[in-house]
Amino acid sequence: MSLLLAKLPEAYAPFDPIVDVLPIIPVLFLLLAFVWQASVSFR
């Protein structure tokens, strides 16, 4: 996979922000689940 990215740096460049955001997505889902659970239990 890294070989492919090394061959296509200009094609991969637009996806850099997506790769930067990827590790944050599970945290966002965790926060969303926590807020949803809290709102459901507070009803």
From Swiss-Prot:
InterPro entries associated with the record: PSII_PsbK (IPR003687), PSII_PsbK_sf (IPR037270)
Membrane topology: Single-pass membrane protein
Proregion positions: 1-6
HAMAP family: PSII_PsbK
GO CC term (a single one): chloroplast thylakoid membrane
Any one GO biological process: photosynthesis
Transmembrane segments: 18-38
Oligomeric and partner information: PSII is composed of 1 copy each of membrane proteins PsbA, PsbB, PsbC, PsbD, PsbE, PsbF, PsbH, PsbI, PsbJ, PsbK, PsbL, PsbM, PsbT, PsbX, PsbY, PsbZ, Psb30/Ycf12, at least 3 peripheral proteins of the oxygen-evolving complex and a large number of cofactors. It forms dimeric complexes.
PANTHER family to which the protein is assigned, alphabetical: PHOTOSYSTEM II REACTION CENTER PROTEIN K, PTHR35325
Family: Belongs to the PsbK family.
Official protein name in the record: Photosystem II reaction center protein K
Described purpose of this protein according to its UniProt entry: One of the components of the core complex of photosystem II (PSII). PSII is a light-driven water:plastoquinone oxidoreductase that uses light energy to abstract electrons from H(2)O, generating O(2) and a proton gradient subsequently used for ATP formation. It consists of a core antenna complex that captures photons, and an electron transfer chain that converts photonic excitation into a charge separation.
UniProt KW keywords: Chloroplast, Membrane, Photosynthesis, Photosystem II, Plastid, Reaction center, Thylakoid, Transmembrane, Transmembrane helix
Localization terms from the record: Plastid, Chloroplast thylakoid membrane
